[in-house]
Swiss-Prot record:
Its cofactor is pyridoxal 5'-phosphate. It comes from the Bacteria. The modification N6-(pyridoxal phosphate)lysine is found at residue 267. GO terms for cellular component: cytoplasm. This is Glutamate-1-semialdehyde 2,1-aminomutase. One of its GO terms (biological process) is protoporphyrinogen IX biosynthetic process. It comes from Solibacter usitatus (strain Ellin6076).
Amino acid sequence: MTHTKSEELFRRAVEKIPGGVNSPVRAFRSVGGQPVFIARGQGSHLFDVDGNEYIDYVGSWGPLILGHRHPEILAALERALEIGTSFGAPTEQEIDLADAIIDAVPSVEMVRLVNSGTEATMSAIRVARGFTGRDLVVKFEGCYHGHVDSLLVKAGSGMATLGIADTQGVPKAFADTTIPLPYNSLDALEEAFRAHGDRIAAVIVEPVVGNMGCVPPLPGYLEGMRAITERYGALLIFDEVMTGFRVAFGGAQQLYGIKPDLTTLGKVIGGGLPVGAYGGRKDIMSKVAPAGPIYQAGTLSGNPLAVAAGLAMLRHLKRNPQVYTRLEECGARLAAAAPKGVTVNRVGSMFTFFFTDGPVTDWESAKRCDTSRFGEFFRGMLDRGVYLAPSQFEAAFVGAAHSDEDIAKTIEAAKTA
């Protein structure tokens, strides 16, 4: 497998774009080599500029649960393009998408559309502070909530991949409003609330972590978190940008039966286009401008193309609940075929092969992974036509377009990678 044209494009890119990429993990820094440049996608497969074909387990980092170029998504986009690309004014389709989200996600009574997961979490934090009149926020080590200044403390995703504990450019005063705690430890959460309970506005959490690899909650963890926040009058925010409509139609909150106060969404709800949303209890969301005093706005919020693609996606998933059964089956088959000496974490169609012998339940245990071994495995799989996330600390995704043949080829590739 050759990558001559990708290498040529990367040489051009590094002269014009920081690091040659528009999001750090794409640069392959942690796995070695240079990124492949994609020419097109179809179904469960990617095709690079050198003509190489890959079975895709990145799925644009989660949004493409139905695969690339799904006909219903394309048809919705074509209809939307005939009408216009952006209006900066309300449309009926925005209400339809809001209805679809509220219908599916148990805790959401009102919802505001934005343009990214980062915007969604940033806005949810502001709303939580405005609603409670408090300033501190609890987050968890290895969880990533977008590149919001105060949430880039001990964050996951690209910061974990590149080994950056805390980014430059965030004033200490911003970081001091964030309390980072170990994930899956109720004792640590209790201690934080005993010390600062009257100042904590919210706890924000990925209910299933995807940004230090896939790390599910231990039994009772989310239930305990819900009880603690209620006892102290703090809001519980589920960051379901990754898990929303992915681990279940109603997200992780449906899967685990826990209702947060606020929820952030993205990825799947845009059908592959840039989008985000935050929503929750009506008494909280009614404080958002212009209905209330907590300001948030966006020129392209509710963009008709993203709304059209997202609405088509959610309607398809609602009509076809068997999609989730298929995703569970494929995820289980892949997990069962993990290489020796590897710990597999999986929730539905999210999974990670952790190159460590021990269980991975938090950031400290994830950090013990042999990232060099993962890099070798990644490159071996890439050479065999399987495209995984280029980081030990990112989840992989099964999509509805993955065929039995795709799964079988992936399992066979893993035996020799």
